[in-house]
Curated annotation (Swiss-Prot):
Name of the protein described by the UniProt record: Cytochrome b
Domain of life assignment: Eukaryota
Transmembrane annotation, as ranges: 33-53, 77-98, 113-133, 178-198, 226-246, 288-308, 320-340, 347-367
Protein's GO biological process: mitochondrial electron transport, ubiquinol to cytochrome c
Predominant localisation class: mitochondrion
Residues the entry annotates as binding heme b b562: H83, H182
PROSITE patterns: CYTB_CTER, CYTB_NTER
Alphabetically ordered keywords of this record: Electron transport, Heme, Iron, Membrane, Metal-binding, Mitochondrion, Mitochondrion inner membrane, Respiratory chain, Transmembrane, Transmembrane helix, Transport, Ubiquinone
Sites where the protein binds heme b b566: H97, H196
Lineage of producing organism: Eukaryota, Metazoa, Chordata, Craniata, Vertebrata
Other observations noted: Heme 1 (or BL or b562) is low-potential and absorbs at about 562 nm, and heme 2 (or BH or b566) is high-potential and absorbs at about 566 nm.
Amino acid sequence: MTNIRKTHPLLKIVNHSFIDLPAPSNISAWWNFGSLLGLCLLIQILTGLFLAMHYTSDTTTAFSSVTHICRDVNYGWLIRYMHANGACLFFICLFLHVGRGLYYGSYTYFETWNIGVILLFAVMATAFMGYVLPWGQMSFWGATVITNLLSAIPYIGTTLVEWIWGGFSVDKATLTRFSPFHFILPFIIAALVMVHLLFLHETGSNNPSGLISDSDKIPFHPYYTIKDVLGVLLLLLLFMTLVLFTPDLLGDPDNYAPANPLNTPPHIKPEWYFLFAYAILRSIPNKLGGVLALVFSILILMLFPILHVSKQRSMMFRPLSQCLFWILAADLFTLTWIGGQPVEHPFITIGQVASILYFMIILFALPSISMLENKLLKW
């Protein structure tokens, strides 16, 4: 008799996706981040659901409702900090997942990669709206600054901003609409994840060598389920250490003060995971130019399949490209640091140099070095 998992209409889908899925035999721990991101999304949806039961999306009570969750709800402090730090962990896994895709040439799976970039935008939008909900000082001013960027769009900009605000400033209407959007977006993200996996399973996984591995496949279960469990345990260890010992390590102290439109914080900055893009935005003196650079800093990921000119898919055997990749990684760390610094000398200059370097490496240096490596292959 055939196993039920292979015949049942629903179990069959699960079987083909997670059990009998043919996977390359040589994929490393860098391939764990897909499952870890799934875990992060699950944690965020569950903790968010419990927070939504106690949260009120009204400017007069939002801040005190978060305080009430932390003080009066059973394990409310734990749920709140799991949700806040879960977002941080989500982005750490996301950046590592994207980095792995860039290093090993996974972007040549065009549809999977583009859905992934759309997912990145969706997660960033969700995180931004979630940051506004506690209605602290940085929530209010962050929302004001970031939404105000849309006013740089010619002709319709100002109208668009007021339409998003629901008035002439960030106020009750803004908070009321951000709350349902923040609630529904994770479910849209979950649906997009399904599409992401659908396209991935059409082609099969990439592997560190970048070579076709059709002749050397092993079943996903038990080999990679066990490997993923190790990743999950390490992630949960890091996560719970963060939540239970230093829950405010990655947060902003300003957000413990209720939102006050009459008092501007000395340095408005978003959460750490947006700082690299924020630094690129600030490094251009023109408002529209800054907004375009901000959007393009993420959208540029979609150009990688077009900019790939190397005869080898992975960077595993391309030392020159490897050097550039790690310079790019260091540049992103620099941009993240600069985004958190005040707008003054020498940070302005460092930010501008790092921003130019970011675009130069991706648009010119990597393709040029790839061409050089192609030439060196013939020698």
